[in-house]
Amino acid sequence: MEGPPPSKRPCGLPPGVRLVVPAAAASASNAATAAAAAAPAGAGAGASKPARPPAAARPAKGTPAASAATTATGADASAPAPDPGAPTWDAFAAEFDVAPSWRALLEPEIAKPYARLLLAEYRGRCLTEEVLPAREDVFAWTRLTAPEDVKVVIIGQDPYHGPGQAHGLAFSVRRGVPIPPSLANIFAAVRATYPTLPAPAHGCLEAWARRGVLLLNTTLTVRRGVPGSHAPLGWARLVRAVVQRLCETRPKLVFMLWGAHAQKACAPDPRRHKVLTFSHPSPLARTPFRTCPHFGEANAYLVQTGRAPVDWSVD
């Protein structure tokens, strides 16, 4: 075997003596040299990516570590962002003077995008037209009847559109305002069942509301002089959702659904509630409302289910 080149020959080795390198050492030296030569080429390319850690070193999907890593890198865009325009309950309740007892039924709806658009459109209408009832009366029904006190639900369509009439209760008008024809027919039906009740001197139904009668229109506002003008705003969707939650939380309610509109707008489960239907109390209805037996039927059901009947007087 040849010895090392003269430049590499160990100092002091006599001439003619050959240096023998063990095979194992030579192999190790050659491998190290090859690795050293390859390293600069790989590092200098600039296009190679660092090696991905083995699977055992990576956090499994769905674990807290994986979630934290995803959040840190901003890669998870699947979670919907909260609606920045949704009103808080406190702001909504303050704007409309909503009773806190209705929070559990109303708050889930006002947080939805459609409700934000509805309220924005309502506020815009208030800037350009006379809207009835007054803002503080739109949710007056919440202040007069708490959910836990509801016995009877009467569904109307939209508020009266004449000046001074609407005040937040379906079919009701303020004291001192002439009794509308529809309400006169309602009073006639009550007296047909309870002839000893005194004839009402006014059309304000707040006494009914305080006794557990929820008087709720499907559309809560209207432009003065233009019936049905605010139906496109979307109040009906909110009202339906609130009534549905009421049906789910309060058993054995009595529903009085007068006319096709009310019967389509509200569909309580007849196995869980007493559902009464009749024509609308308008004088234009085909069937005279004065013959409607609902007021007596409602009280009979309330007594049958262990509750006090409703006093249908208005004073």
Swiss-Prot record:
Bias (Low complexity): 35-80
Subcellular location: Host nucleus
InterPro entries (alphabetical): UDG_fam1, Ura-DNA_Glyclase_AS, Uracil-DNA_glycosylase-like, Uracil-DNA_glycosylase-like_sf
Record field: catalytic activity: Hydrolyzes single-stranded DNA or mismatched double-stranded DNA and polynucleotides, releasing free uracil
Catalytic site: D158
GO CC entries: host cell nucleus
Main location group: host cell
Protein origin, superkingdom: Viruses
Keywords for the protein's UniProt record, in alphabetical order: DNA damage, DNA repair, Host nucleus, Hydrolase
Disordered: annotated segments: 35-88
Name of the top EC class for this enzyme: hydrolase
GO biological process per UniProt: base-excision repair, AP site formation via deaminated base removal
Function: Excises uracil residues from the DNA which can arise as a result of misincorporation of dUMP residues by DNA polymerase or deamination of cytosines. Therefore may reduce deleterious uracil incorporation into the viral genome, particularly in terminally differentiated cells which lack DNA repair enzymes.
Family matches, as PANTHER family: URACIL-DNA GLYCOSYLASE
Annotated family: Belongs to the uracil-DNA glycosylase (UDG) superfamily. UNG family.
Protein name: Uracil-DNA glycosylase
Name of the gene: UL2
